[in-house]
Amino acid sequence: MVIALVVIWIMFSIITDGVFFEPRNLSNLVRQTALIAILAIGMVPVIVTGNIDLSVGSVVGFISIIVAYCQYFIFPDFLGGMFPSLEAQTTFLGIQTSMNGVISTALSIVVAVIAGLLVGLWHGTLIAYLKIPAFIVTLGGYLAFRGGVLLVSGGRTISPVENTLVEIGQGYIPKNIGLILAVLVVACVFVSVMWGRNQKFKYGFEKYPVYRDLLKAAAISAIVMFYVLYIANGYEGIQNPVLLMVIILVIFTYITKNTRFGRYIYAYGGNKEATRLSGINTSLIVFKVYI
């Protein structure tokens, strides 16, 4: 798979006379990959527990169209009527907008989170407690939410939305801040690798030679610095979606490795029956995974 990917990259580089490997193009590819990676992070516990979610793309589309609808049709009139004094244009974190625009974006995020929770509650209840196969439930959700997108939008583009909301998905972090973050990430990588090595020694696990752990940390650090110095700072800086992806990944890693719920997920995925006989509420695990 890796060899095939490298061959494809080389082919596109030859076809485009090297444009494929320019920072601007790689930056756009990383942004698109980050959005998919955020969805993939949420899919990991679903797959680990032996389930599936075919509706994730349709759910994202449905929630996105609800947010756009609220931003275009509901929030401007609602906030403009309640806070007319906040309609004046101003600058917020370097973005030209109004305070009502900032409030609108905050409300949109709340709406998106609530909508996602409701979908998760619905799917989780049907799969975990009513014992309907996940394939059937999420396939139905795939079709239903795709239809919901057409119902809400009427098949038309809903725009424009607030600049602050656009900035979350399309904005960049200043290059100097991105470089500082990269140095911090590299430091955290080495600390994490060495801490993990000490933990293995503490609990009696076999340890690899120290140079292997250092090479592992160095390889990860090299990838991080290459991304920041060549791809990100070679264009406009680190993309906001990439930063969000990293934050979500750190939170997810902590939950799965350092919490009871995370260990329950892996226990369920390893042996469902043994997990149930151990007194763990397996239905609740599946329910939470879909939320």
Residue ranges: model-predicted function:
Residues S283-I291:
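Transmembrane alpha-helices
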